[in-house]
Structures are given as structure tokens and as C-alpha cells.
Curated annotation (Swiss-Prot):
The gene is gatC. SUPFAM superfamilies: Glu-tRNAGln amidotransferase C subunit (SSF141000). Belongs to the GatC family. This is Glutamyl-tRNA(Gln) amidotransferase subunit C. Coiled coil: none annotated. It comes from the Bacteria.
Amino acid sequence: MALTLADVDKIARLSRLHLTAAEKEKSLQELNDIFAMVEQMQNINTDGIEPMAHPHEAALRLREDEVTETDRAAEYQAVAPEVRNRLYIVPQVIEE
């Protein structure tokens, strides 16, 4: 699957990104490189390979679960353009 500049334009528009022509070209190349790598990975024969959750057998030692940050929602929402009932109000992007 290869994207076109029209696809990049649509993605940028939906993401509300304003890209220059050079940025669009660079994004197109990078996205197509990613898709090529994914396609290559999908073609790898994995028959007989046992699925695993983690590449290493050893489990990591985890720290105690304790609060390290305070609730800063009010501070963050104070600078937001619009907040209602502690929710950020954003422009609609997807058509109904």
C-alpha cells in the first residue's frame, strides 16, 4: 500500500495540521517507508515460533505503587480555550 500526496493532504486536514509542500513530501516518504516495513514484516514466516508477551524471560522489578504527582487538572484547564464540566471542548473533526 502506497500513499499519495492527496492522502497526506487528507490526513493533515483531519489532524488540523498545516504542512508546507516540503513537509508533505517528507511525510509521504516517511509514511510509505513505514508501510513498506510493515508489509515486509507481514511476509515473514512465523510458523513454529511460539508467541511471547516479552522478548526476555526475566520479569522486571517494579517499584511500589505510590502517588508521585498531584492532580493538576485545574491548572491545565485554566489555559484551555474552552472547558465545560471539567471536559476540554474541541472543534468537531469527524462529520456525522
